[in-house]
Swiss-Prot record:
PANTHER family per record: UPF0102 PROTEIN YRAN
Protein name listed in UniProt: UPF0102 protein BB4515
Stretches for region Disordered: 13-44
Alphabetized GO MF terms: nucleic acid binding
Domain of life: Bacteria
One Pfam family matching this protein: UPF0102
Similarity comment text for this entry: Belongs to the UPF0102 family.
InterPro entries tied to this protein: Restrct_endonuc-II-like, tRNA_endonuc-like_dom_sf, UPF0102_YraN-like
Length: 177
């Protein structure tokens, strides 16, 4: 085989491999709940996010955005509490077993939220904060048995934590109070 023929054979083989591994486009029928606003679980989550948004607004926070998505994950709610940007994770558990809704946000989930926030922060700041970037606080609204529990300041983004009250950082860069 000549050099050109070998390259052509490899190119055809690579093309055939790509064809084999190509996924068919998802049709609306292939995605569960695509036409009716999502699966029952998604609709339930959206209802609790709406309830959390209304509840936090009654507590004095101002809504900025909801369901912010990027490749690193999703931020359920973005709100403003005075001069603090508050990113809210909404969790729901029917029963308090295994620690309940708030306990389901471990170190790995906090890391995903922080990575998503790092990617989404420039857009949020451009839209809602002219000037110096504000402190960024993560709150959790945990619904257990239908009742909201607000964990204010569950964790902070290390580079956007307020100066007062700092006691240091843990191994992942979270502010420890």
């Amino acid at each position: 085989m000549t050099d050109t023929a070998t390259r052509l054979a490899f190119a055809r083989a690579a093309q055939a491999q790509r064809r084999l591994h190509r996924r068919p486009p998802a049709s609306p029928r292939a995605r569960p709940g695509a036409r009716d606003g999502g699966s029952p679980t998604q609709r339930r989550g959206q209802a609790y996010e709406s309830a959390a948004l209304r509840w936090l607004a009654r507590q004095g926070l101002r809504p900025l955005a909801r369901n912010l998505r990027c490749r690193a994950g999703e931020i359920d709610l973005a709100m403003r509490d005075g001069e603090v940007l508050v990113l809210v994770e909404v969790r729901v558990r029917a029963h308090a077993g295994y620690g309940g809704a708030a306990a389901s946000i471990g170190a790995s989930k906090q890391g995903r939220l922080a990575r998503a926030a790092a990617l989404l922060l420039p857009v949020l700041l451009r839209r809602h904060w002219p000037g110096a970037p504000p402190p960024v606080r993560f709150d959790v609204v945990a619904f257990e048995a239908g009742r909201p529990h607000w964990l204010r300041g569950a964790f902070w983004l290390a580079e956007h934590a307020p100066a007062q009250g700092r006691r240091g950082q843990d191994a992942q860069g979270w502010r420890v109070r």
